[in-house]
């Protein structure tokens, strides 16, 4: 399996601390050594860094670790390959344009007997993850030829994720740069940091940061991950089938495929 990393914040924020912890799991403290990638939204633009090498050994990952890019929405991924060979075209996150915006997607899991009909969006690589992303965007494009608000789009996203989940494991992060959508099939955790801020210690490497010194009292930053990245904070664990929509660090919608949306 792979591991996911997402962030939603109300001010441009760097994710160096969380990324430093995640990259250790790419071959050092974890087995996810088959590539990594991270995408930073900057307005309508997107900075995408990818490398099929293990993140713990990647010079590109070290560059990202040293270069504090500030963003309000971030999606990251470290890969342990199961479908598709280890190469750049199979490295998450995947990006496509829809409605004049960059849509970004990362997936943790594996889908069995998954061969959707390719229409407008087609995979470049040969992973089930990219095939699912293309299928999802094809559904959205067919149902909504013109842009709609994400609240109108949510039922379609949830329905598609529910179908993918029925074919295996489907934990995912999805964004268009304005919002961050999360769907949990088996494993996902979340923490929202806001004032009063305190220190945090990474689990995978001896690094501590004092968020009080790095933030303002008005900052709200939510981090999503497959497993908790820090050892001294309380992370909230998603239940299977649970989904959430984040905007500027706050949860604006949530629910479960088993229950009605909140």
PLM region descriptions:
Residues 73, 146-186:
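Catalytic core of PPM/PP2C metal-dependent serine/threonine phosphatase domains
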Residues 2, 103-113:
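Conserved beta-strand-loop-short alpha-helix elements that form
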Residues 52-64, 78-100, 117-119:
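Short acidic (Asp/Glu) patches
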Residues 128, 186-209:
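Gly/Ser/Thr-rich active-site loops/lids in small-molecule metabolic enzymes
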Residues 38, 109, 132:
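Residue-level signal for inorganic ion chemistry
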Residues 199-242:
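A conserved acidic, glycine/proline-rich C-terminal tail/linker
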Residues 1-59, 200, 241-245, 249-262:
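Extreme N-terminus nucleophile/cap motif
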Residues 113-115, 120-143:
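Glycine-rich phosphate-binding loop plus the immediately following alpha-helix
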């Amino acid at each position: 399996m792979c591991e996911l990393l997402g962030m939603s914040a109300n001010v441009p924020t760097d994710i160096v601390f969380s990324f430093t912890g995640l990259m250790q799991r790419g071959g050092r403290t974890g087995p996810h050594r088959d590539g990594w990638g991270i995408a930073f939204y900057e307005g309508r633009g997107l900075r995408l860094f990818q490398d099929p090498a293990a993140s713990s050994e990647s010079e590109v990952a070290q560059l990202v670790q040293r270069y504090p890019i500030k963003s309000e929405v971030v999606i990251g991924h470290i890969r342990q390959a199961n479908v598709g060979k280890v190469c750049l075209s199979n490295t998450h996150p995947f990006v496509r344009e829809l409605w004049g915006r960059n849509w970004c997607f990362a997936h943790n899991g594996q889908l069995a007997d998954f061969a959707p009909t390719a229409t407008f969006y087609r995979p470049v690589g040969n992973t089930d993850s990219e095939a699912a992303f293309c299928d999802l965007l094809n559904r959205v494009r067919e149902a909504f030829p013109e842009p709609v608000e994400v609240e109108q789009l949510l039922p379609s996203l949830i329905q598609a994720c529910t179908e993918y989940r029925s074919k295996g494991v489907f934990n995912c992060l999805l964004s268009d740069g304005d919002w961050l959508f999360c769907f949990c099939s088996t494993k996902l955790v979340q923490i929202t940091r806001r004032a009063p801020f305190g220190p945090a210690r990474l689990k995978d490497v001896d690094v501590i940061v004092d968020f009080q010194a790095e933030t303002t009292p008005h900052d709200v930053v939510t981090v999503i991950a497959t497993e908790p990245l820090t050892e001294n904070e309380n992370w909230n664990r998603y239940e299977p089938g649970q989904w959430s929509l984040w905007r500027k660090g706050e949860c604006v919608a949530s629910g479960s495929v088993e229950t009605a949306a909140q």
